Amino acid sequence: MNNLKKLDGKKIALIGGAGFIGHNLAVHLQSLGAKVNIIDGMQVNNLLSLVDNVDNLPYPDLSRAIINERTQILKTAKIHIRVQDARDYHALSRLLNEINPQIIIQLAAVSHANRSNKDPYSTFDHSFRTLENSLDWARSNISSLEQFIFFSSSMVYGNFKKNIVDENEVCDPLGIYGTLKYSGE
């Protein structure tokens, strides 16, 4: 818990942070006193992509309610959402220079396995290119950046051979998504 107290006042950039994990993480970090900025191109796995496709979802009314609730939660928490495609290195760099984060949390990815396998080029671009750009900025700003956190996935382990899996298990990534997460590690 002491490490969490050290987040008070820290500037944190969540790249690809408008999805399910990102918006929840942003709210929690903000509640711990961090100054959170979400950077997201709003193209996959996030609120805006849900809004654009809500009528095609199995439960459109429920989906609308979820979207409205997420939006209200972020608004109430006063979390800044910067709409920026992290695949654009120069634009991302300008935005990160403006924010000057002490911590970067890299969440950007196409996380839906079927979508990832259907369009591997786009998946690579949204998952790996964004990581490359974020790491390149981090390398250039190593004196001010305290931490770079990459969110991976259990997909790097493939089909679990036992109930509990930890970092000592052999990696056997599943599909494009799992392979790109493993490559990112």
Please state what every model-predicted region is.
Residues 1-185:
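N-terminal Rossmann-like NAD(P)+-binding domain of SDR-like oxidoreductases, especially those catalyzing
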